[in-house]
Amino acid sequence: DVVLCVLPLFHIYALNATLGMVARNAATIVLTQRFEPIAALAAIDKHRVTNVAGAPPMYVAWSAQEGLGEALAGVRLLVSGAAALPRNVMEQFETLAGQPIWEGYGMTECSPVITASLVSGTPKPGFVGQPLPGIELELRDEDGDPVEDGDPGEIFVRGANVFSGYWPEGSQGPDEEGWFAPGDVAYVDEDGDLRLVDRRRELI
């Protein structure tokens, strides 16, 4: 595989989820200093890119380019993260490019990926998929109890991917049972896919 990464390497999405996975799988990465829509498409063609790790503004910009389907003909996987991808952008992009964008949800404190539509196997506008293997996810109400199926609740995550706490004293990390609350509110649909609906609090 050849992966295009125009994301800043100081961000964990680029460093862990992109560069780290490239190294782990002995793939090739194509780096650019900054994102410029036409230049990025040219790099995809020049280096025969097969996978793209991106963020919503990239796909918004590309949606305005002519011949998008031809430019991305050799790409097998388009991934979006770091922010919510607007539903209309996802639908428009799929119409123009002829292939879907796969979304994920995560944060630095969780190394970073928590859920991904690649796990569920179906890209669904507005949803961020299911937990990665080895990651537990619960939705809880204000009393800390699990919510009823289909009801929104605060996200709690547990797994080896979760950090131990903030430097230097390790504060605000997981509880004694290993559960960490990112501060987001979501619900799970009948397929088991997660949809973010609110933000309960800021971590910092």
Identify the function of each model-found stretch.
Residues D1-V2, F10-N51, Q65:
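Conserved AMP-binding/adenylation subdomain of ANL enzymes
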Residues L7-H11, A83:
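Conserved AMP-binding
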Residues R24, K46-G54, S63-P123, E136:
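Gly/Ser/Thr-rich phosphate-binding loop
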Residues E36, P57-Y59, L85, V162:
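Alpha-helix capping/helix-boundary segments
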Residues A82, G106, G129, D184, ...:
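Active-site glycine-centered loops adjacent to acidic/histidine catalytic or metal-binding residues
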Residues G121-F127, G173-D175:
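Short, P/G- and charge-enriched loop/turn segments at secondary-structure junctions
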Residues D145-G150, E154-I204:
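Conserved ATP-binding/catalytic segment of the ANL
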